[in-house]
């Protein structure tokens, strides 16, 4: 169930255009438009889904004292590496992460009530860099929907 559920979410981000690159939320996410229940109002989000058939290097920019974090989630919904907060290069491989596909999410602090601060946070988002010899392609399993739904209730799986 975990792999099917994670693949469903990965595909939803791929369908938004977030494959092999980062998509950036340029303003705080309204409460009624949150894709997960824990999104914060003082954070701008960046996200991407990557194929680790080829190593991926992500550069976290130097943000001074502004908070930024990078979270990595594999297809089994594990965080195989610690959340990263410091500037620098981080290389992800299939061996290190444990699955072919990975979700990478960034949070960048922004004052939701200050348009100038949001512009500064947007500039930081634009400095997040991705290096990869080949972006690959997204080929998640074709999970049988009825089995996947049944497994959402553990007693029926």
Locations of the language-model features?
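A compositional/structural signature for long, glycine/proline-rich flexible linkers
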Residues: 1-157
């Amino acid at each position: 169930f975990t792999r099917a559920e994670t693949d469903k979410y990965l595909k939803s981000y791929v369908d938004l255009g977030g494959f092999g690159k980062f998509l950036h939320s340029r303003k705080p996410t309204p409460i009624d438009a949150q894709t997960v229940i824990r999104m914060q109002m003082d954070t701008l989000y960046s996200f991407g889904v990557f194929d680790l058939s080829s190593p991926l290097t992500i550069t976290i920019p130097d943000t001074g004292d502004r908070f930024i974090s990078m979270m990595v989630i594999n297809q089994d919904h594990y965080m195989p590496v610690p959340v990263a907060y410091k500037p620098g290069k981080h290389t992800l491989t299939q061996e290190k992460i444990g699955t072919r596909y990975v979700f990478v999410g960034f949070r960048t602090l922004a004052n939701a009530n200050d348009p100038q601060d949001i512009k500064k946070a947007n500039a930081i988002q634009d400095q997040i860099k991705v290096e990869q010899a080949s972006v690959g392609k997204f080929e998640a399993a074709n999970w049988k929907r009825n089995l996947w739904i049944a497994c959402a209730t553990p007693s029926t799986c």
